[in-house]
């Protein structure tokens, strides 16, 4: 109950910020980037951290046993519907947080298909290359350069004073949830994983601004944020099956 109350209070504070930010005097570029990297993004993803016990639906265990299915997908679909409703009502703030909730739930549902930690490691090693290709040569590049409205729909926003915003693609949010959930499921270091992924995202934003590029792939930073804080544990877990044989 304490965690749920904290989540609702934080959500209310974020909604209040998103409402007020456009009416506050604008910041310089670097002040805006630092605000996003070290305040807005961590605080927004703190919602995911507070909701983390829901990754395996244990809080709804009796319902799950009766209905014989997980509730991640139905709940995620409900949030998608809410996001569409808020969008139709021209209330992007509501749509923004519904997208964050929906993709987080889908990420935790996706995690249930990973039967071994090695699968998670493999994904963490592969997706940075896929994301890099997509951002620099593939569909993400085409969407961000020629279809800004599509990217807006398929991303979450972090609003700064003056009304400007940085955006993070929904696949990035999904894998943030996957790796955070995996750190709990496989007995790794959830807190350090959470902090590591936030550092990876923050550095990605700072480097993109410093190098004056339109955008950098976010998944390399997220993957490293998962792999590096857990490197010794991951190595031990991978060696254990070999030693048993």
Q: Regions from the language model: what does each represent?
A:
Residues 1-245:
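A membrane-topology feature that recognizes alpha-helical transmembrane segments
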């Amino acid at each position: 109950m304490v965690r749920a109350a904290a989540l609702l209070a934080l959500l209310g504070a974020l909604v209040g910020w998103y409402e007020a930010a456009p009416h506050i005097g604008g910041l310089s570029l670097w002040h805006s980037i630092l605000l996003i990297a070290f305040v807005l993004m961590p605080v927004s993803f703190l919602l995911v951290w507070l909701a983390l016990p829901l990754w395996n639906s244990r809080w709804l265990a009796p319902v799950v046993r009766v209905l014989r299915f997980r509730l991640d997908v139905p709940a995620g679909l409900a949030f998608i519907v809410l996001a569409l409703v808020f969008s139709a009502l021209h209330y992007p703030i509501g749509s923004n947080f519904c997208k964050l909730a929906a993709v987080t739930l889908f990420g935790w549902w996706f995690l249930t298909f990973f039967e071994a930690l090695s699968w998670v490691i493999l994904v963490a090693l592969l997706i940075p290359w896929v994301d890099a290709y997509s951002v620099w040569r593939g569909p993400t590049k085409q969407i961000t350069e020629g279809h800004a409205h599509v990217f807006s729909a398929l991303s979450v926003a972090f609003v700064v004073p003056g009304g400007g915003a940085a955006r993070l693609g929904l696949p990035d949010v999904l894998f943030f949830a996957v790796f955070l959930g995996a750190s709990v499921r496989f007995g790794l270091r959830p807190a350090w994983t959470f902090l590591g992924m936030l550092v990876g995202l923050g550095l990605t934003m700072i480097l993109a601004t410093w190098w004056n590029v339109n955008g950098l792939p976010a998944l390399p930073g997220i993957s490293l944020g998962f792999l590096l804080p857990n490197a010794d544990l991951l190595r031990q877990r991978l060696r254990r099956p070999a030693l048993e044989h």
